[in-house]
């Protein structure tokens, strides 16, 4: 459906200043005024809400039309009898259908008219529509995003950070964010507890599955075993070159000697003990021993085979000193093969301090994260508000370009065949209001709530998912019945057949 207008008096248009106009013609039967008429003196027509010029020699300009002059009563003061606007409405219904006359006119035009120039003009015209459409879409989509990015990073965010960190004592934007932080901290505590249990079990399993402990020696924390010839059941001959000027008096018994095994931490820090055989460079089992000098030492009844002698040996180990011997945590067995209570308590205190430090670091990390998240939510709200105002401004200022874009897209859509149009409509409707669209809407609303820091409510999300798709479904059905059923009935029939 086309509506044409023609200005009888072209003096209303000032070609040197197209933005100024003295006449405001009314287009369509509802008499809606234009903001400013197009600066041209040739006839124009309106299709799909856009005003386009009628090219000279085209089919539209040569059709027979019914001219009905009118003057709006509301704006009759603007016009005189000489300044009347002629509206070209619809063609008269004749004996033959209008399509016959159109086909005949086009056939005669192709025979006798300058077809080359007409085709070139039409291609130029559609090229202008295409470029205008691309430019308008680019402006409408990218300009608000650029405004959002610039405002968010350079204007809104610095101001929000300053006021939030200086004048606002709270870390969380609302109670929902606080609950989320507490839940994360509780999960972290459970994780640490689980790792502690696993580590303790692994340590116990390692001791239980370890190889049988060898006697007559010392186990160090790194697993190294040092044989001690003095702990053998029978004494060995000691090389005379091993010690220099040492008076060693060691009494040994034939009973089972004291065995130094891994598992008991007797020394909490490095000490120097008066045990020459603990020196790292000592050789044994009849091997060559490098010459080693020691200080004066007096050993008397250091090791015995009975329980009382073992206690005496422990005390002597702690009391004597050896010059140059660097022992790294000698391990002795307790009565049950476990750590001594004092050593175990010290290790537990160290472990508790480490766990408390880990908790403190995690708490600071969560506080920093949610403080930044609160700032981000406020920044997103104001930046998106500026983007919305920018979009509204563009929609007002680019009204003509938007009409051209809408006309071009509609023409491309109606240029498709009925099956493609039906499939395209079905795809859009199923994505937005289809059976599986509820999950998509849930993700969308969760993103919106998280984006603006709104307390997330499952009841509110379910309510929105239950109402908004229904409203969109009603809107789509109205558009299909009201507009598509008139312009393309075959498409509606194909669409209904696909649905059924």
From Swiss-Prot:
It comes from the Eukaryota. Its main location: plastid. Pfam families: CemA. InterPro entries: CemA. PANTHER family: CHLOROPLAST ENVELOPE MEMBRANE PROTEIN (PTHR33650:SF2), CHLOROPLAST ENVELOPE MEMBRANE PROTEIN-RELATED (PTHR33650). Belongs to the CemA family. This is Potassium/proton antiporter CemA. It comes from Chlamydomonas reinhardtii (Chlamydomonas smithii).
């Amino acid at each position: 459906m086309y509506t044409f207008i023609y200005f009888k008096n072209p003096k209303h248009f000032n070609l040197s200043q197209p933005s100024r106009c003295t006449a405001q013609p009314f287009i369509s039967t509802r008499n809606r005024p234009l903001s400013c008429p197009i600066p041209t003196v040739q006839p124009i027509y309106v299709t799909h809400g856009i005003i386009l010029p009628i090219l000279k020699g085209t089919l539209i300009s040569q059709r027979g039309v019914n001219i009905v002059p009118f003057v709006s009563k509301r704006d009759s003061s603007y016009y005189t009898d000489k300044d009347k606007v002629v509206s070209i409405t619809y063609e008269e219904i004749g004996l033959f259908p209008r399509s016959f006359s159109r086909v005949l006119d086009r056939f005669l035009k192709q025979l006798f008219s300058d077809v080359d120039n007409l085709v070139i003009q039409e291609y130029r015209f559609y090229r202008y529509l295409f470029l205008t459409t691309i430019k308008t879409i680019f402006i409408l989509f990218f300009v608000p995003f650029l405004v959002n990015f610039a405002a968010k990073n350079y204007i809104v965010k610095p101001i929000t950070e300053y006021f939030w960190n200086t004048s606002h004592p709270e870390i969380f934007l609302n109670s929902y964010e606080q609950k989320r932080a507490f839940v994360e901290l509780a999960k972290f505590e459970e994780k640490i507890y689980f790792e502690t249990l696993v580590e303790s079990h692994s340590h116990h399993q390692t001791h239980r599955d370890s190889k049988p402990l060898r006697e007559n020696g010392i186990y160090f924390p790194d697993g190294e075993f040092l044989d001690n010839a003095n702990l053998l059941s029978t004494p060995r001959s000691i090389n005379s070159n091993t010690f220099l000027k040492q008076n060693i008096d060691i009494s040994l018994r034939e009973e089972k000697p004291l065995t130094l095994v891994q598992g008991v931490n007797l020394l909490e820090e490095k000490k120097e003990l008066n045990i020459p055989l603990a020196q790292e460079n000592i050789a044994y089992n009849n091997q060559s021993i490098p010459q080693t000098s020691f200080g004066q030492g007096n050993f008397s009844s250091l090791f015995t085979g009975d329980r009382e002698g073992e206690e005496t040996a422990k005390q002597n180990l702690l009391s004597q000193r050896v010059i140059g011997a660097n022992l790294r945590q000698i391990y002795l067995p307790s009565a049950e093969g476990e750590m001594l209570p004092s050593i175990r308590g010290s290790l537990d205190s160290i472990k508790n301090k480490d766990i408390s430090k880990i908790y403190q670091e995690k708490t600071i990390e969560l506080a920093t994260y949610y403080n930044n998240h609160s700032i981000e939510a406020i920044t997103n709200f104001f930046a998106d508000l500026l983007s919305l105002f920018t979009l509204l401004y563009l929609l007002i200022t680019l009204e003509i370009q938007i009409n051209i874009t809408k006309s071009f897209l509609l023409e491309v859509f109606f240029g498709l065949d009925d099956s493609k149009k039906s499939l395209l409509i079905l795809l859009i409707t199923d994505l937005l209001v289809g059976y599986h669209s509820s999950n998509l809407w849930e993700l969308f609303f969760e993103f919106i709530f998280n984006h603006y820091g709104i307390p997330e409510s499952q009841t509110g999300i379910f309510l929105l998912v239950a109402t908004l798709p229904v409203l969109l479904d009603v809107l789509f059905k109205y558009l299909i019945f009201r507009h598509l059923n008139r312009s393309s009935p075959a498409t509606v029939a194909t669409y209904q057949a696909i649905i059924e």
